[in-house]
Amino acid sequence: MKLKHLHLVGASLALALFGTVAIAQSLNGKPPSDFGVEVGEPVTPVSIDIDLSKQPTAAEWKPGDPIREAAKRQYYPLDAVKPHAPADWVTSPDLLGDRQQLWDISRGAGSELKSPNARINIDNGNTGVSPGDPVIEVSQNYVLYGVNNSGGTIFKIYNKTGTLLAGPTTFKTLAPAGDPCATSVSDPIIHFDRLANRWFMLEMGGTSSANRLCVYVSKTENPVSGGWWFYGFATPAVPDYPHCTVWHNAYVCTTNESSAGAKVYAFDRANMLNGATARAAQRFTSV
């Protein structure tokens, strides 16, 4: 991955999204040397116009098949651990818990979303991979479920009454032929972007020489036949255990990149929703 290094000052996205870094900088005069912003390359999307309900389904694990287990991460020496942020770095408090409580109170009784069948049971069983890293997300009309599978990361699409509409489908079957994302690794992420009424999916893909964050953004709220945009973002290290969220001006994802530490990526949400070339992703080092 070709990366350009920029100083944190003047990087408006960094200041908008990562207050922790900004606070550390303002109090200490300048950030640590590895707190610069790295900029990748623009990514041109590939349009995916297929009906997922008519695609071949992924083979599911059955008793007797091998089970692949992820190796536990170790630090060397074995009694060493990654240090916390230095004590003299002042960081912003975590207000999420308080805000969640205020949100729960403000909703009031009877404001829950209703559906004909409020409970949907997804009995997935063993997938041949440990851990499975299951994820689930809902929209007004659909439920998407993703999990690690022996043949690659898979997802299923249900309606709100629990009827399976499509899948299991492997993420890699949506990637263009020959692209590194045609090799599925693990760690599915699925979000419903409620601000745009679209789906956002991501998995860790690629090969040892071509690491990727493989991103799929739906063209409509219909994940079955509404179409998708594919974006393959190169990363300089294995982007293990990604987690993402939706911000009003970016899709923001974190990764654990081994000796490189925890990283934060900001992706061009506006262009990705429109199927346009995504401006270069920005990569930050976490506190």
What are these regions (language model features)?
Residues 1-2, 23-27:
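Basic/polar N-terminal segments that are highly enriched at the extreme N-terminus
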Residues 2-10:
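Bacterial N-terminal signal peptides that target proteins for export
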Residues 10-21:
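Bacterial N-terminal signal peptides
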Residues 25-287:
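C-terminal PAP-associated
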